């Protein structure tokens, strides 16, 4: 890396890319100062994209010096019509409020999309491929993979091996909770992985009772136990006494940048409107029991209309019911016609309904199978046939 930095002509390869750069008017570019300059990979990024007419806002995270000439050295790498704003250095102690004030002072007139005009009821499934799920934009402004790994009932080396296998197979969404008792092991697996932290979206949940009564401690305990710098989304596990108090506490951690998005688990129509009226940040996601035998059509439509993403736990029906669902004749016949498994049909059905799914598994082969649902599509008739299986049959008490 030092050799690359010493060569101004060096252009390290970038493993990923920004989709549809034309959709952005303003681009923030952050980097550490390296020998008084921006890392050469920033040059690669600037030369790989068209910044014509865009506003570019540089910032750095140097611990010693200011941004200096590191940003002006980059100006020649973009078109003359690109507008460069003055850069700023942030220290390691900078918090969200300092960054927010800086952005306000820039007077950029950034128009953020609202939940009213953001459609979260369907996904761009054509952009996915086996081993790489597409993402959905949350109302918090963060992108989240639409297919992941649930870790309920997985513990010790089993959960560590499951998370490792999932990450190796391309899964980038991991769900856990305080009540699962496996946050520590999941954090260890993520830290041991070669996958960059920013590519992994991690859920956890705090539980009614003591955690809702003292939410600040519960939230900090989750951050400390996972030990992965920040939590992508924290959910309230289900309604209970002090749930508004707990949610408002999470909002404070969002302001500090330690939690990125907030959601709810096991919330329904009769509860959501009253709850939203008492908080400041609208939930980005609701995680409920949803599967072919309990389809929650009204709830899904209602939450989607609020701009809230829906996520299914128990996508295969849950404990004691998975076998029956996977052997369901309707589902099995559809699976046979596509040359895929019944589990893959069920997951594809969720995704085509605009519902994120987090199937749990400790079997690496099943984990790979579950992330491989982007090379076939269910017909309208097949979607209708599965919709007809709805029995309003809830398999858990939430």
Show where each model-derived region lies:
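N-terminal binding-site loop/beta-alpha segment at the start of enzyme catalytic domains
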Residues: 117-200, 317
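Beta/alpha (TIM)-barrel catalytic core signal, keyed to glycine-rich beta->alpha loops juxtaposed to Asp/Glu
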Residues: 125, 134, 238-398
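Short catalytic-loop micro-motif centered on adjacent basic/acidic residues
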Residues: 29, 57-60, 86-87, 148, ...
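Short helix-capping segments at alpha-helix termini
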Residues: 49-52, 78-81, 192-199, 226-228, ...
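Solvent-exposed loop/turn segments at secondary-structure junctions
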Residues: 33-37, 62-66, 90-95, 154, ...
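A short, structured active-site edge motif that brings together acidic residues
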Residues: 58-62, 86-92, 197-210, 232-239, ...
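Active-site-proximal alpha-helix that buttresses catalytic centers in soluble enzyme cores
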Residues: 1-116, 169
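Short, acidic/polar
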Residues: 154-167, 211-227, 245, 270-274, ...
